[in-house]
């Protein structure tokens, strides 16, 4: 089957379309139209702060690892103590909580002759020190504590504080234990804010105390060192991923190199230089060996404080900047120079850092020592401190204080792995520079690899570590694999993405904030224009640019310096573009007088300035005038300097910009091209064409084809942000974009802007291609769009455009409970306890013990009973003893002597039909994640939940009773993001009716949470809050955004004719599954 694929990538969505085509490429049938909505990897409990699941789970994982390793370390210490014949007694078993401090002071002060007493007290002291052992430089080995340094600054500060607080002199040789015992124990606060030990002590301070104790207790040197080893034992997770490093495809026995390594940084510069070409008289030539080495040396050794510029590279080569091309070509590693030449990023990052000791060390270190430092700073490499250069790195780290170490953690070096090993990179770099060849030729000469060969790319769905990107990769991978399995390989895959589609949500919000600030600034300028210039109506964007340019230029013509105003000025492109269109960037547009604009015409300013006789026109004078320009309102001075510098570069350019072609609409985003290369390699054997374009292309295509005015969404025709189906529609439109069409769309967009700036008649609509081939391709494309619009109209009308999300069925989904730890309520066991009190029991065992008491009544609970006696987990509890109850009615968990609320940490909800009444009733059991932990290796949706679980205790009473009597039938389960098809005719609230009156009947709803034991939270599946307009009815915001529709479970399932829809990757309804995947079911 022949079909085209379109993929539209957004921040929280991926539009996917598969369209069957005939032999002529005309669309004949839609195979799959899916708007896949995802969470961009955000933690559901941290959406406001845009913290990802990856970040949250990383914190939780590191915390668990910290506790796990501490527990293991203390267990090893206990075993060591037992091997010495000393007893291990829990510190809590001593009646005096300050006893360990007194023992430590005693051991350091005098010899204890009784061997048994000495052994017990040594055990107490070592176990106490090991639990509060201070900080050590993570790069210093434990053996460095055998001969500890003198007192740390923190130790000295604590000594002075104790001297002041106690009023007693503190000997210079006092240990930590001895200093503490000088305080009034029990009256002064020891730890925490305001405590005498609030300063962070070093492990060397505690090692000195152990050294003094061992000396006083006559412990030999060998045993002393063993004690130091076991008390201060530490593990580092650094390098734990080194075993998973990929191999070099050219030398499979070697690991792929770090991108922060010197070998890769030099290779990257050499490879990108190899892509450069010089344009001479319409021909292109490669750089000579001498030219390549000149440029390479300049970029590698560029002063860190100086920014790299292509203009400087052109000057080194003795050419005009416009003659230098090939600056945006991508290498095998997905590296692209783009706006600036490549530099040694590792060197610049370190030297530009504000970590003075590191900068000084780096400048004097050898290449091998710098290499060892990069490995040490990388979490992915194992430290090599045994080599001579590694030892120097360790020595450097050992001399740093903890403040500098904190700064080191914030140092950002280039991340990721190169495609090749360091040896391969060095050899390829040497070959490219010595022979003056490009990467492909160097690879052929060095390894005998054909130029057409490319390094193997990861599979489409392989994670990259960015949660938002990983969501996109997984979605695209699953959909393409299913499509290929169903219909074969596609003929074309066209990918389009918005700027925020391949960045984190946090970064997307930052960019959105910048856009809002610019919009507010522009709105203020628009108002200023209307007031000062008496402009009628809202000024255009072109008017705003002209107004800003005139103000910025001190009301002077940028070319000759003569006075201009907003009304008599004209906008001109400093450097015109070859062919149709212009470069419509701010740095290439200036306000000029009519005389200069007419005289210059379609010529670069630098060329025209040499030949014109107009007074004041020269490159030198134009550059001088920019020095006096006024900074734009709201623009930072540093940004304005960069802007004027870019304008100066344009003034000096003597060649035209390159003609617009299909590449003008291609994406330059690294991750977009990474996705393209993965998809291309996946379909390499099928000859599938794969392209990736910038997000603006779809909007241009919709407008140019007229398809926007033909498709009706919920809120009318045209672009819709309210209707989530537009993502799939955009994907369908992009699927039929060819290189010729993309090029024509780019030119039309460019002409539109140019003509607006020049105040010319809008003739851009008439442009359909630069030559006969382009115009023919345009006509065919318009025909395809006509047929496609008919297909899409039918699909929208018949509700065949799918909006779906992945549902999370695994056990872990966000935090298991809230962070705040509260105090348990304590009541006497003999007290009267209501049923609600008993349901607040702090453990399942306590709940069971109370409900199994002879006097328990399911309605009244337990009466007061001074003789009551129960057993909880083998422990006898008597009437006078306290029992712990949760002080809140919400689901909670006992934790660290207190409790934490479980919040909305539900894994799923089970729907039951209760048959004990006159007519069937429906109820819901919300299942907490914690109640499923014992069953993680079983079917989580069918395991039996006992009455004592928090899930059962939080359920409606009618459901608990029905389950107890066997009158509840388990129908099926729901999870967040499940799709429900609902007939709202009998159950719609006034708010839902108001929304349906404005937008039409809403059949498809999304489960957005389990609001209460008896209510769901639903939102319209196909609608997004982003599209809610200010003039919309208030009910629209309440139903789509907050709080959503909160229908009672019984009413919804009794009168809503509900179907729970489950779909496969292509959006098709799944009615059965041999793989035990979730299937569609109907509530009846």
Curated annotation (Swiss-Prot):
Swiss-Prot/TrEMBL keywords: Antiviral defense, DNA-binding, Endonuclease, Hydrolase, Magnesium, Manganese, Metal-binding, Nuclease, RNA-binding
Keyword GTP-binding recorded: no
Required cofactor(s): Mg(2+)
Enzyme Commission no: 3.1.-.-
InterPro entries on file: Cas9 (IPR028629), Cas9_alpha-helical_lobe (IPR040619), Cas9_b_hairpin (IPR040796), Cas9_C (IPR041217), Cas9_Topo (IPR041225), HNH (IPR002711), HNH_CAS9 (IPR033114), HNH_nuc (IPR003615)
Gene3D superfamilies: 3.30.70.3520, Ribonuclease H-like superfamily/Ribonuclease H
Pfam families cross-referenced by the UniProt entry: Cas9_a, Cas9_b_hairpin, Cas9_C, Cas9_Topo, HNH, RuvC_III
Residues of the active site: 8 (for ruvc-like nuclease domain), 573 (proton acceptor for hnh nuclease domain)
Record-annotated HNH Cas9-type domain positions: 504-665
Binding site for Mn(2+) 1: 8, 496, 500
Top-level taxon of the source organism: Bacteria
Annotated binding of Mn(2+) 2, by residue: 8, 500, 727
Biotechnological applications listed in the UniProt record: The simplicity of the Cas9-gRNAs RNA-directed DNA endonuclease activity may be used to target and modify a DNA sequence of interest; this enzyme has been tested in human cells but is not highly efficient.
A molecular-function term among this protein's GO annotations: zinc ion binding
Quaternary state and interactors: Monomer. Binds crRNA and tracrRNA.
Function: CRISPR (clustered regularly interspaced short palindromic repeat) is an adaptive immune system that provides protection against mobile genetic elements (viruses, transposable elements and conjugative plasmids). CRISPR clusters contain spacers, sequences complementary to antecedent mobile elements, and target invading nucleic acids. CRISPR clusters are transcribed and processed into CRISPR RNA (crRNA). In type II CRISPR systems correct processing of pre-crRNA requires a trans-encoded small RNA (tracrRNA), endogenous ribonuclease 3 (rnc) and this protein.
Membership in a protein family: Belongs to the CRISPR-associated protein Cas9 family. Subtype II-C subfamily.
Domains: entry comment: Has 2 endonuclease domains. The discontinuous RuvC-like domain cleaves the target DNA noncomplementary to crRNA while the HNH nuclease domain cleaves the target DNA complementary to crRNA.
Name used for this protein in its record: CRISPR-associated endonuclease Cas9
Organism for this UniProt entry: Corynebacterium diphtheriae (strain ATCC 700971 / NCTC 13129 / Biotype gravis)
Source species taxonomy: Bacteria, Bacillati, Actinomycetota, Actinomycetes, Mycobacteriales
